[in-house]
Each structure stands twice: as C-alpha cells, then as structure tokens.
C-alpha cells in the first residue's frame, strides 16, 4: 500500500511540475508572433530582435524543463 501511495505521489509531482510549461510556451509564442506581425505597434520595445530573443529564451526554458522531465523522470 505504501509503495502504491509513493507511486501516486510521484505521478502527482511530475504532473504538477509539467502542467504550467505548455501554457507558458504558448504565451511566449504568442508574444513572438505579435512582434513578428506588428513590430511597429510595439512602442516600448525599440530593439525588436532583443525582445524576441528574450521570448525565445523563455520558450527554451519551459521546453527544456519538459524534455528533462520526460527523459529522466517519466516512466517508460
């Protein structure tokens, strides 16, 4: 019984760690799309390439987190 509870807790923790990443990725992808489609409309960002780079870094962070969780911690 204790083993089953530990497995359930493990699955819950992995799920909790994985859950926010897809939404964050979509949010930052949307920001990049805004920069690409309407660069003149973004007045507070004079360096569009730098702003896009920041968004790409954020996408990479969440993508990498999912890759690590899936590669090292999810059961096969």
Task: Report residues per predicted region.
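Extended, charge-rich alpha-helical interface modules
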Residues: 2-76
